[in-house]
């Protein structure tokens, strides 16, 4: 048994930590993207509605 090789549970723990970090990163990125896209969509709808009302009169 070589001393350089880390224990199995340590490797598993590291993989779990990496998985958690990646999941958190992806989740936060998708949430931020979703919020900004929703905000832009609502702004666009509002301006489009105002433009259509102005041009219908």
UniProtKB/Swiss-Prot annotation:
GO cellular component: host cell plasma membrane; membrane; virion membrane
InterPro entries: SH
Entry superkingdom: Viruses
Ranges facing Intravirion side: 30-57
Membrane topology: Single-pass membrane protein
Keywords: Host cell membrane, Host membrane, Host-virus interaction, Inhibition of host NF-kappa-B by virus, Membrane, Transmembrane, Transmembrane helix, Virion
A GO biological process held by the record: symbiont-mediated suppression of host NF-kappaB cascade
Chief localisation class: virion
Pfam families noted in UniProt: SH (PF01445)
Subcellular location per the Swiss-Prot or TrEMBL entry: Virion membrane; Host cell membrane
Virion surface side: 1-8
Transmembrane segments: 9-29
General function of this protein: Plays a role in the inhibition of the host NF-kappa-B pathway. This inhibition occurs at the receptor level, by preventing the signaling of TNFR1 as well as IL-1R and TLR3.
Summary of subunit composition and partner proteins: Interacts with host TNFRSF1A, RIPK1 and IRAK1; these interactions interfere with host NF-kappa-B activation at the level of receptor complexes. Interacts with host protein UBQLN4.
Family listed: Belongs to the rubulavirus small hydrophobic protein family.
Protein name per the record: Small hydrophobic protein
Organism: Mumps virus (strain Edingburgh 4) (MuV)
Lineage start: Viruses, Riboviria, Orthornavirae, Negarnaviricota, Haploviricotina
């Amino acid at each position: 048994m070589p001393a350089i090789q880390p224990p199995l549970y340590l490797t598993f723990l590291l993989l779990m930590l990496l998985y958690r970090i990646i999941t958190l990163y992806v989740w936060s990125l998708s949430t931020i993207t979703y919020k900004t896209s929703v905000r832009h969509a609502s702004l666009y709808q509002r301006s489009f509605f105002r433009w259509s009302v102005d041009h219908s009169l």
